[in-house]
Amino acid sequence: MVIGVFPAAKLGILAIKQVSKPIANVIKSNAKSSPFFRKYICMPPAQFYNWVEVKTKMWALNMGGRVNVPPLNEAMAIELGANLLGEFIIFSIGAGLLIFEYSRQTIKENKKNELAQSEKMELTNMLTEMNFRLERQDAQIREMTRVLADLDSRNIFRWHKEPIQEYVPFDPDTPDQSASARNPKKFDSLYDPQGGMAFRALHFLDTQIFVDGRNRKAKEALQHLDEVAVQLEQSLGEAATVAVASSLPTKAADL
C-alpha cells in the first residue's frame, strides 16, 4: 500500500485559519483600550461605514437626496470600528493564506512542467543520437558491401552460392529483412544457374542429367508393377479354371 506525502502545508494553513478569529478578538480588545487605536484606527472607518450604510439604505428605499447623516457617538464608533478591524484581520489572514497556497501550487506545477520538459528533451536527444548512429552504420555497411562486391567481381573462383547483394537499409514495414525475402528464388534446382562455374555445372547435372535417370527409374518401376498385375490376373484365371474342371466329374458321378 502506497502512502502519500503528509500535507503539512495544508494542515498549517488550516491551523492558522482556525486561530485567526481569536487573534482578531485579542487585537480588537486591545484597540478599544488604546487611545491611538480608538482615535485613528477605529473611529474613522466606523464613521465612514455608517455613512455608506445609511446612504445605501436611503437609495434602496428611494429616499435619496441631500440627507445629512448623523455621526455615531464615540462608544458606538469605537465598537463598530473594533468589529471592522477584527473582520479585516480575519479577511487578511484568509486572503494571505489563499495567495500563499496559490503561489505554492504554481511553483510546484512549474517544477513538474520543467521536469517533464527536460525528460522530453533528453529523450529527443537520445533519439537524434541513435538516428545519427544508424545512419553512420548504414553508410559503413554500404561501403563494406561495395568493397566486398568489388573483390568478389575480381576473383575468378566464386565459392559462394549466391552473389553478394546490395545493402538495403532496414525497413520497419518489412519484418523479414533476409536476402531470400528481398530476392526470392527464381529457379527449381538447388544450385543457382547464375552463380559461379561450379554452381552452373551442378545446376546442369541436377536438371539435365540426373533428371533423366530419375525418370528412367520411375518408368522401370511402373513397368514392373504392370507385369506383376498381369501375372496375378493370369494366376487367378488359371485357378478358377482348375476349380470348375474339378467340380464337373463329381456332379456326373452323383447323377
Curated annotation (Swiss-Prot):
GO terms for biological process: regulation of lipid metabolic process. One of its GO terms (cellular component) is mitochondrion. Residues 168-187 are annotated as: Disordered. Keywords: Coiled coil. The keyword Coiled coil applies. Residues 108-154, 212-241 form a coiled coil. Pfam families: OPA3 (PF07047). InterPro entries: OPA3-like. The keyword NAD does not apply. Belongs to the OPA3 family. This is Putative OPA3-like protein CG13603. It comes from Drosophila melanogaster (Fruit fly). The lineage of its organism: Eukaryota, Metazoa, Ecdysozoa, Arthropoda, Hexapoda.
